[in-house]
């Protein structure tokens, strides 16, 4: 009898030690230095304008910086925002963002600025910037921090007492050019990026998603798309939601062209409170329609509500939220499910 009890105690002790060891290992991994074997940056795509005198202007290109970790996985992650690439770099409070999280997980990470925005703003056409007083308050509701400034949603995944976090978030913007023409131009450059770097999964946010969908029609090197809170879609001719085409579509293409989207897995991810601020309820319904059309023709598209997997309070930019590691875990599951995590 005593021997049985001793064995039980020993078993419990071993289990406890293994749990502590695993926890310590994971903690050490999270805080360990990130080892990079290669990093750099380059412009890609674009045009060259010229005149009769031989003068020229390089313009309408995209710009990317990248880091490749030691012993990288085979598929790159291209992080594509529509408002500011900085959203991929940090959590709202300055903690680790998706760039660092996925470098630690072994993925080559590319931070992308499409033509005309951020570090690629040398355009071939004239643009005018007009300061918009009140944009900060507009961001508050558009990013679903709350239904009305300055009233935060209860449990929102933002450090609401951190004034510097709000200051940094308010400065994480640059001009957006939300037209179908611009979306096509950006996808032209992005397709050239994919062809240069090889098989990649595009991670997008907001208007970036429609641009990545268009990119998939122009390259065979887009291995998947994960769209965080996408607001624009592409449909087969005659099967879209109808209505006037605006900056976020809807765009319709011939069925045979649309079927290219059935060759890669796609996931549309949504945060919390989508029915309480902005026009996200409609965007959510459009994501369901898009998935329905892709799957109708043999594709693999899914819609994930983070609340359905127990994640509460996420904003329009969940990969920068305070629980972004848990959000990243959902992405890791998607990548593994589709064989996109191989080394």
Could you tell me what each predicted segment is?
Residues 29-72:
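N-terminal cap/lid segment of alpha/beta-hydrolase-fold proteins
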Residues 203-212:
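Gly/Ala-rich beta-loop-alpha elbow adjacent to hydrolase catalytic centers
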């Amino acid at each position: 009898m005593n021997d049985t009890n001793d064995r039980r105690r020993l078993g419990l002790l071993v289990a406890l030690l293994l749990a502590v060891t695993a926890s310590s290992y994971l903690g050490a991994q999270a805080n360990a230095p990130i080892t990079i074997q290669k990093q750099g940056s380059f412009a890609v795509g674009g045009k060259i304008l010229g005149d009769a005198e031989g003068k020229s202007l390089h313009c309408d290109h995209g710009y990317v910086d990248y880091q490749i970790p030691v012993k990288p996985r085979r598929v790159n992650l291209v992080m594509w925002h529509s408002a500011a690439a900085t959203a991929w770099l940090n959590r709202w409070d300055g903690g680790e963002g998706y760039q660092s999280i996925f470098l630690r997980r072994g993925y080559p990470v590319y931070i992308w600025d499409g033509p005309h925005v951020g570090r690629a703003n040398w355009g071939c056409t004239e643009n005018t910037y007009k300061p918009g007083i009140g944009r900060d308050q507009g961001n508050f509701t558009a990013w679903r921090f709350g239904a009305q400034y300055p009233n935060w949603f209860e449990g929102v995944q933002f450090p609401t007492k951190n004034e510097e976090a709000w200051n940094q978030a308010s400065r994480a913007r640059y001009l957006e050019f939300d037209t179908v023409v611009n979306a096509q131009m950006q996808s032209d450059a992005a397709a050239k990026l994919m062809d240069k770097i090889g098989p990649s999964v595009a991670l997008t946010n907001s208007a970036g998603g429609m641009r990545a969908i268009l990119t998939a029609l122009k390259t065979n090197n887009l291995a998947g798309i994960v769209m965080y809170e996408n607001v624009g879609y592409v449909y087969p001719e005659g099967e879209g939601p109808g209505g006037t085409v605006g900056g976020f579509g809807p765009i319709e293409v011939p069925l045979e062209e649309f079927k290219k989207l059935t060759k890669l897995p796609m996931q549309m991810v949504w945060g919390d409170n989508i029915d309480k601020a902005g026009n996200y309820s409609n965007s959510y319904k459009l994501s369901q329609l898009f998935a329905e059309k892709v799957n109708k023709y043999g594709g693999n598209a899914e819609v994930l509500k983070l609340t359905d997997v127990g994640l509460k309070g996420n904003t329009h930019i969940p990969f920068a939220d305070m629980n972004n590691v848990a959000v990243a875990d959902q992405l890791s599951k998607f990548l593994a499910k589709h064989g996109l995590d191989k080394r």
